[in-house]
Amino acid sequence: LHSFPTRRSSDLQFRDEVKLRDYYRGKGGGMTDAQLDVLFARRFAYQKEYAVANTRAIVALAHEYRIPLASHDDTTDENVVDAVNDKVAVAEFPTTMEAARGLHAAGIDILMGAPNVVRGGSHSGNIAAVDLANEGMLDILSSDYIPSSLLMAALQLPRHVPAIDLASAVRTVTKTPAEAVGLSDRGEVAVGRRADLIRVHVARDLPVVRSVWREGRRVA
């Protein structure tokens, strides 16, 4: 799988520049407006010079070697058009409902971070994974920056979204991501699959992994 970020220099993860600046101040240790002006100007200049050519080269290589592609932080209808034209398989962390609806309508799997479910929203102030799930537009959960959040989110999702049962929630961290990247030998308990399994105990609403099997052999 190859993932690339937003390709157009006119796009921002945040449509509100005030929120963008607040985000970078927190992330950058208190940068001033003047420092942010320099940072943004430099990054947009790099993007304008290199983004299109690099993206076209990456997409061509991915298609040649049959490597699935993922878009990242799609925000606008224009981003959706790019994703469709590039034959993207997965859309990581769309930042607006507008983009998510367009991606979903195009048949592209939508991926959100499991921490987004666990903490009740995006750490950067973008759309909540549960809001997407309520509209039937959440296909895959990734661990993002907290690996242990995968199981936690799979257990919590049915509580937040009654239309999603536990089996469907578990598929967001097993079968669906495996299928999205072409790994047909894993992702579900079925004849002919790898038999990668875990045994989980739930204690005080938290999942605790008790046993692990890899290709049918217990390894933990």
Where are these regions (language model features)?
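Glycine-centered positions in the ABC transporter ATPase nucleotide-binding domain
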Residues: 215-216
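His/Asp/Glu-enriched, well-ordered alpha-helical/loop segment
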Residues: 106-116, 120-200
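Short, small/polar residue-rich loop motifs at catalytic or cofactor-binding pockets
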Residues: 205-207
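Small/polar loops that bind or transfer phosphate-bearing groups
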Residues: 1, 71, 91, 142-143
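Short aromatic-centered micro-motifs
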Residues: 212
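Histidine/acidic residue-rich metal-binding segments in metalloenzymes
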Residues: 12-110, 122-137
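Short, small-residue-biased leader/transition segments that mark boundaries at the very start
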Residues: 2-9
